[in-house]
UniProtKB/Swiss-Prot annotation:
Activity regulation, free text: Inhibited by 1-(1-acetylpiperidin-4-yl)-3-(4-(trifl uoromethoxy)phenyl)urea (TPAU), 1-cyclohexyl-3-dodecylurea (CDU), 12-(3-adamantan-1-yl-ureido)-dodecanoic acid (AUDA), 1-((3S, 5S, 7S)-adamantan-1-yl)-3-(5-(2-(2-ethoxyethoxy) ethoxy)pentyl)urea (AEPU) and to a lesser extent by 8-(3-((3S, 5S, 7S)-adamantan-1-yl)ureido) octanoic acid (AUOA).
Species annotation: Xenopus tropicalis (Western clawed frog)
Disulphide bridges: none
Enzyme class at the top of the EC tree: hydrolase
Membrane topology of this protein: Single-pass membrane protein
Name of this chain's protein: Epoxide hydrolase 3
InterPro entries to which the protein is assigned, alphabetical: AB_hydrolase_1 (IPR000073), AB_hydrolase_fold (IPR029058), Epox_hydrolase-like (IPR000639)
EC number: 3.3.2.10
Subcellular location: Microsome membrane
GO biological process: lipid metabolic process
Length: 367
């Protein structure tokens, strides 16, 4: 079944990228329905374990202590002048130090960066934000409020609002996608780019069209285009599909010493459990195809790419494809025995590589 669906998805995706307009979106939704079919066995598994209990979920009444603690930095809010959006962040380090801006992925929040907030606050003003629609930040209800251009404008406004003109930009997963794109569009605002388990958009576009296995692994992107169904699937059996990717043996954190405690798992369930809170993060994906077709976009700032070898969502084999899109000093490291959740899985190794990278002297000639 996997092989059959992979081939069908590949045919539909390749065709969609050759057309425009209404037909393009028809094909996207055909792919979404194919993806939904692939998740039917998983949904049935959850239902057969107890049909009534599968549909029992509700908002957590209180955030876990680790999510509100100041152990990793001070919590703050900043409101953007133009958009009016209020962002929640956790910051550590002297405000006179250079800014290191940390961008999380899906379905996460600032807490993903706790190890980096601790590590780099002695030399940087480290700021881990909750992206628009996530965590404690505002979550506009309209689909169009999550278009790429708006998300990039958020980053511009955040950097300036925090009192800086440039930053070390660090992103993981969706935060990595934003970081790649921001570094292309606003290179003068980025001194160093550090990306974890997120492909350059152009490289991913090329890779996925020639690797059906990756297309199948990424089929959730198509599933998330559908209304309501993803929200229901992610909520089933008390948000099992949020917990499981973080914790199980195949998808979750591999390092025994860094396995999430029950309280830490709740740090990633608390916000999605609130009424209507899953839709804004899913709207990132629902706007993704408006970003296609992807054109070749070169990064012109020193770039570090880190990848967990055992990423169950994004194949490590695509890492060599990234270098062609970076016309600046580039370093790529695949971390053995590490999952998609790299900065939480192997924090000591990740932090050392980042620190060594930031110590290097780069002479970059800007065009």
């Amino acid at each position: 079944m996997q092989l059959y669906l992979s081939r069908l998805l590949l045919i539909v995706t390749r065709t969609a990228l050759r057309v425009t307009g209404v037909f393009f979106w028809v094909l996207v939704y055909v792919a979404a329905l194919l993806a939904a079919v692939s998740y039917i066995p998983d949904a049935l598994r959850l239902l057969t374990r107890g049909p009534l209990s599968a549909f029992r979920w509700g908002p957590r009444k209180a955030a876990p202590a680790c999510l509100t603690s100041s152990a990793h930095g001070q919590h703050g809010y900043i409101r953007m002048k133009d958009s009016g959006i209020r962002f929640h962040y956790v910051a550590s380090g002297d405000k006179r130090n250079p800014l290191m801006l940390l961008l999380h992925g899906f379905p996460e929040n600032w807490y993903s960066w706790r190890y980096q907030l601790d590590e780099f606050s002695n030399g940087y003003r480290t700021v881990a934000i909750d992206l628009r629609g996530f965590g404690g930040s505002d979550a506009p209800s309209r689909l169009e409020d999550y278009k790429m251009e708006i998300l990039l404008q958020d980053l511009q406004d955040l950097i300036r609002g925090l009192g800086y003109s440039r930053c070390v930009l660090v992103g993981h997963d969706w935060g990595g996608t934003l970081a790649w794109t921001f570094a292309v569009r606003h290179r003068d605002m980025v001194t160093h780019l550090i990306v974890m388990n997120a492909p350059h958009p152009s490289a991913f576009h090329d890779y996925v069209l020639s690797h059906p296995s990756q297309l199948f692994s990424s089929r959730y992107v198509f599933l998330f285009q559908l209304p309501l169904i993803p929200e229901i699937l992610l909520s089933l059996r008390d948000f099992e599909h949020i917990k499981k990717p973080l914790t199980d043996a195949t998808h979750g954190i591999q390092n025994v010493e860094c396995k999430l405690s029950k309280e830490e798992v709740e740090a990633f369930v608390y916000y999605p459990s609130q009424k209507g809170a899953l839709t804004p993060p899913l709207n990132y994906y629902r706007n993704l195809f408006g970003f296609f077709p992807v054109k070749a976009q070169d990064v012109l700032v020193p770039t570090l790419l880190l990848w967990g070898e055992h990423d169950a969502f994004l194949e490590a084999a695509m890492v060599p494809e990234m270098q062609q899109y970076v016309r600046a000093p580039f370093r790529a490291e695949i971390i053995p025995n590490a999952s998609h959740w790299l900065q939480q899985d192997r924090p000591q190794e990740v932090n050392k590589i980042i620190r060594d990278f930031l110590k290097e002297d780069f002479l970059v000639h800007r065009n």
